[in-house]
Every structure is written in C-alpha cells, then in structure tokens.
C-alpha cells in the first residue's frame, strides 16, 4: 500500500520473499498490484530458481509482469518434470540455453571449492525387502507406457506405489550396519568424528516432489523421528564421548548449533533435508549420505555443503 501511494520517480526499495509466501494468493496479488511503471523498473532475482517450476508457483507465472528477471541455481533442472523445466526456462527467457554456466569442476579448479574424494558403499536389500520391491515393481509396470518411455500420467495410486517402493530402499535394514562400519573406521583413523555431517535416509517424499508438497500421512513424522534417532544413536554407540546434534526442521537455536559445529563443540550433525539448500557449513570435512536418492539436484546441493572453503580445512 505504501509503495502504491509513493512518488514512483523517487522509489528505491527491496522486497524479499520466500517461495512459500510468493505462492500464497494473497501475497502474490499484493506484489502484482504494484503499478505497471514500478514493475517495469523492478528486477526479479530468484535464488534456487528451480523452485519456480513447482506446480503452485508455475500456475502464477503468466501473471508476473516484472520483465527483468534473473534466475540463480546450482541445479536448474527438475528431475522427472519436463513441464516444470520448460516453465522455468521460458520464464527466464532462455529456452535454448542458459545465459551463464559455471560448473562445479570450474569452481574447484579455480579454488572456490575444495577438492574431494567420494567412496560409494553398496547396500543390498534383504530377502523380504527384495520380495516386496519386486512385487511393487510389477504393479508399477501396469502404469508404464513403453512407447513413450515414461509413466502414463500421474495419479494417487501411482504416487503411492512409487513412494512405497522408495521407502524400501531408503529404510533398508542393512544400511545401519554399513553406516556403523563407516563411522567406526573414521573414528579409528582420526581418533575423532569432528566436522561430520550425516544425511539420514528419508523416503517420505518422491524425488520429483517439491519442498512445498504436503502429506496427510501422520506416520511420516513418526518415521522421520525414529530414523534420525536411530542413526544418531549409532554414532554415540561407536563413540560415546562424541557430541551429536540432530539438525531438524524447526530447530530453535539453529545459528548457535552451526556455530558450535564450526568450533568442534558439536562434532556431528545428523539431518535429513535441512542441510540441503541455503545452509553454509564450511567447516565440515566429512559427509555421509545414507540415501542414494538418484536425484542429481540433491546430490549436488549436499556436496556443496561440504565443499565450501575454510581456513582450517586442508583437503
């Protein structure tokens, strides 16, 4: 309202909003109610721009009248979402190619990120898990269009089956023992577990879903708590004197926790998705990914947490 009543020729302002707020109709209408002259002068900068392709935001893009736009993302492509990808590219006017690209390899070679070593650990499903996985896969085959090479549409039954199958992989029982071995080996080699990030298995949402998707399943939160508690407990079983902190959604003293992690007062952070985007933990030296989601975006984002440069990190 104050912007609408101001002298447009003397305006100088910055509006900051989250994607969750931007997607709300009331907030969106308020932003779009600015005069056409103001909107022509504005510059829209979208960080983590891949989120623009989320269904609840994508539906509003044709009503955005701000012409000058910059989209920033280390992971611009949305997995299994051609429609969302097309919408993002069109919105920022780069249908054919990106305006500017800077690869992770270039960032490492130019000294902006540190070099790293990556060690995959293969975990196999047990007999019961494999039997259930095959059973669900046969059910999913009925939805698959061989000619198109993709699933024919997306409905509730298909989504539930995909989610159910994904949970089998993420919650595979053998992961716990492999994780225990990795933690024990690190502790024996270094005598400490300082500066370690642990990404606990998820399985609560599909890789192609967005952070704004909701769930009506009350057991999801219970599963999350059980999983993160279990992996936190394993760390403490290997080294009872190690300080471990769960980094979860809604954590009250977030900045304090990250500060204590950087000084080594908190040695290990266990998390699910809260350390994916927008969190800087440059002091981290080891990250353990307990879930191979197959989602390139998540893998890149998580590597980004540990590849930040720090004066005391010599890798």
Where are these regions (language model features)?
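Structural recognition of the conserved hydrophobic beta-strand(s) that form the central parallel beta-sheet
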Residues: 15-18, 67-74, 268-271
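Inter-lobe coupling linker of SF2 helicases/translocases
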Residues: 90-156, 160, 173-178, 182-185
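Post-DEXD/H (motif II) to motif III coupling segment of the RecA-like Helicase ATP-binding lobe
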Residues: 51-116
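SF2 helicase/translocase ATPase core recognition
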Residues: 71-74, 81, 118-136, 288-315
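Hydrophobic residues in beta-strands of the RecA-like P-loop NTPase core, especially within AAA+ ATPase
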Residues: 45-46
């Amino acid at each position: 309202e104050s912007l609408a009543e101001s002298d447009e020729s003397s305006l100088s302002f910055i509006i900051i909003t989250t994607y969750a707020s931007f997607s709300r109709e009331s907030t969106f209408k308020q932003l779009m109610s600015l005069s056409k002259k103001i909107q022509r002068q504005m510059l829209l900068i979208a960080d983590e721009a891949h989120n623009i392709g989320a269904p609840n935001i994508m539906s509003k893009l044709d009503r955005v009248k701000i012409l000058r736009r910059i989209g920033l993302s280390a992971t611009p492509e949305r997995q299994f979402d051609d429609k969302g990808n097309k919408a993002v590219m069109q919105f920022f006017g780069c249908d054919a190619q990106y305006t500017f690209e800077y690869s992770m390899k270039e960032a490492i070679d130019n000294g902006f990120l540190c070099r790293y070593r990556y060690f995959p650990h293969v975990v196999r499903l047990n007999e019961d898990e494999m039997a259930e996985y095959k059973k669900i896969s046969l059910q999913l085959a009925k939805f698959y269009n061989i000619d198109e090479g993709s699933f024919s549409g997306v409905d509730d039954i298909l989504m539930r089956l995909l989610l159910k199958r994904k949970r089998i992989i993420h919650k595979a029982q053998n992961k716990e023992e492999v994780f225990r071995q990795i933690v024990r080996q690190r502790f024996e080699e270094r005598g400490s577990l300082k500066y370690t990030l642990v990404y606990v298995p998820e399985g609560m949402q599909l890789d192609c879903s967005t952070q704004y998707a909701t769930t009506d399943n009350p057991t999801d939160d219970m599963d999350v708590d059980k999983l993160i508690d279990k992996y936190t407990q394993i760390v403490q079983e290997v080294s009872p004197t190690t300080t471990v902190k769960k980094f979860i959604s809604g954590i009250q003293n977030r900045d304090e926790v990250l500060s204590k992690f950087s000084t080594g007062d908190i040695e290990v952070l266990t998390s699910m998705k809260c350390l994916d985007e927008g969190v800087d933990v440059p002091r981290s030296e080891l990250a353990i990914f307990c879930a191979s989601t197959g989602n390139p975006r998540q893998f890149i984002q998580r590597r980004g947490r540990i590849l930040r440069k720090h004066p005391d990190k010599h890798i």
